[in-house]
Regions:
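Class I SAM-dependent methyltransferase SAM-binding "motif I" and its flanking Rossmann-like core
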Residues: 11, 82-85, 89-155, 195-203
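Active-site catalytic pocket residues across diverse enzymes, especially alpha/beta-hydrolases
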Residues: 44, 119, 175-179
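Class I S-adenosyl-L-methionine
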Residues: 1-109, 114
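A generic local structural motif
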Residues: 14-18, 37-38, 62-64, 120-121, ...
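Short secondary-structure boundary/capping segments
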Residues: 20, 42, 67, 123-125, ...
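Structural motif
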Residues: 32-33, 54-55, 137-138, 162-166
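A contiguous loop/helix-start segment that scaffolds small-molecule binding in enzyme catalytic cores
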Residues: 2, 60, 71-75, 131, ...
């Protein structure tokens, strides 16, 4: 059995109780490199085999999963945040389906919620916004045209924008072009809830 487990947003104690117990029971753990707090690996039992997926190809990850299944070992695939958000789990699940290997998912706390907690803010304020849009700027992974920053900005709902810190000037321009007022409150949060977290309050323009 393979378990896709969300490691949470950063702080080791923000993993779910279920996620912690799965780590304690695992015979094999494949974790997402530096994106996952290494303190979480302390939950693993002494005999657990641990692999860093940052140094592995998808084929190598799947090979470990298949070997574990054949040996009747329980495997945890430890992803950052919540596996369902930018976790690239679908391609792994498709291959597991093809191989006939069963799997389950355990949710985690995503970065946008860790950031909100660090800033003591609420995304859904009566009279301002009752919706939260989770999106990203286009990088190596293409974003459908209908999901452009401008089209989402037109709703003027709260937005959590991932994987985009290297494109802040362009992001600001596109948010304003889409409909946000220049003075709309904004924040930049790096490594939310980690010990070296950095957070900056600003506006959409700045």
């Amino acid at each position: 059995m393979v378990y896709f487990v969300g490691a949470g947003t950063g702080a080791a104690d923000l993993i779910t109780v279920r996620g912690m117990r799965l780590l304690e029971q695992a015979d094999v753990i494949i974790y997402a490199g530096s994106l996952v707090n290494p303190e979480l690996l302390a939950y693993a039992k002494k005999e657990c085999e641990i692999f860093n997926s940052a140094t592995m190809t998808l084929s190598e990850v799947l090979a470990v999963m298949q070997q574990s299944q054949e040996a009747e070992k329980m495997l945890v695939r430890l992803h950052t945040g919540d596996p369902s958000i930018y976790g690239a789990i679908r391609e792994q699940m498709d291959e597991l389906d093809r191989l006939g290997i069963p799997y389950e998912s355990c949710p985690g706390v995503s970065a946008c919620f860790g950031a909100a907690a660090s800033l003591n803010i609420e995304y859904t304020l009566p009279g301002i916004s009752q919706s939260l849009i989770i999106t990203r700027m286009e990088g190596k992974t293409k974003v459908p045209t209908k999901e452009s920053i401008e089209s989402f900005a037109a709703h003027q709902a709260s937005m959590a924008i991932y994987l985009s810190t290297g494109m802040l000037e362009e992001l600001s321009q596109r948010l304003i072009a889409g409909g946000y007022e220049k003075h709309t409150p904004a924040a930049l949060v790096y490594k939310a809830t980690w010990k070296d977290e950095e957070a900056y309050l600003c506006t959409v323009e700045t």
